[in-house]
């Protein structure tokens, strides 16, 4: 049986229901409500992201040298596990369709988690998503750069995604998803702020600043190069401020 959380089985591509749903996301008009397949593709990717964060942060707990950071990441990891369950419960049930089919990452999500996991981000066609010469940065990210990436790239982009989705959710048809988004957003913002305070305390030397911003710059380049704009997951509708 396939594992919906295995990146090797859910690499982004033009085929499959998830890709069809994301294509529908891109083609929805500014005022149209989210359709069933669009909503399923979004919620399925949220589930994938939250489960991936649960597993990744659980791994990082044993690699962080400071006890306070370990405690923070352990608690945050458990919240991400709960978020994944919330989104799993809100995947639509359609005749003849396995809800796990929707649990798949898009290209920006795949690239982001490859870099955070210490792997060289995947290629798009014949060209790598990562800028040339960045392989060592992604193969050996330090504890502090990873902590900063979580709270200065991942959570801010995830919060933006959830907020944009919430703005477009219909109070009639999307009430269960909107409720889950509000619950998850509350946790994400709290973890983001607590993590940012921690990063600011730990970045205490010029070397720390250089290491953090080198990793953040390359990580943002990877995510943007994979197609991300506002947030991490593509949401239909106009972006405020554009």
What do these predicted ranges mean?
Residues 2-241:
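Non-heme di-metal
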